[in-house]
Amino acid sequence: MKSQAALSKKSLQLGKRHLELMDELESMLDQGKSFSTMSDLAKQLKISLRTLYEIAPSKEELIVTTVDRVLKKHGKIAMDAMNAQSSPIRKLESFLAVANQAVGPRLERFTQPLNNLNSSKQMVDYHEQYITTVIKNLLDEARINKEIRDIDTQATALLLGGLGRYFLSKKHLKDLKQTPEETSNFLTEIIIDGIKLENS
């Protein structure tokens, strides 16, 4: 959590040019391009190495910072989709539909480089914890509104919030018949349908 706080503080200190460079790096990763060193990236972006080090102290931290920014943008899209709905259960369904895209083809290109980075775990854990908290709050509201059965909302939130990351792991990925996103959506629908009350 300390690492995530440092990332947030760092993002507040970045200037307009730094943010533009991060957009360029995001575009590079989106296109599947890579860079071996900070110096290599500086050449590709046609900037000074010093400017790059103002954003992050290492290649590893730069990738983590960029992916953190991408996930926050995606989180905002999920929250906007949720807020467009009226009832807690509809909000939950909309939120999860977008949240599961985090393990879809596009965002997987960003998260895949994190697999071998030790410093990425805290950042990924932070985002998963945030998603789980949103899910639990919506489940609690849905239970109060009698839209779902009287369930253990914490356990259900942990399950729904961790599906994508679970199926994205190399250990399980090779055995899936569908993509992690499709599998997560399939199981999410089964779980939600199983806890809904008839009047919802």
Residue spans for each PLM region:
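Secondary-structure edge/capping motif, primarily at the C-terminal ends of alpha-helices
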Residues: 81, 107-114, 167, 171-174
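Amphipathic alpha-helical packing segments from all-alpha helical-bundle domains
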Residues: 119-145, 154-158, 166-169
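Generic hydrophobic, amphipathic alpha-helix propensity
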Residues: 13-25, 41, 66-70, 74, ...
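Helical hydrophobic small-molecule/effector-binding pocket
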Residues: 89-113, 125-129, 197-200
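C-terminal peripheral helix-coil segments that are non-catalytic and often amphipathic
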Residues: 1-8, 94, 133-144, 162, ...
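Hydrophobic alpha-helical connector segments
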Residues: 65, 78-105, 157-160
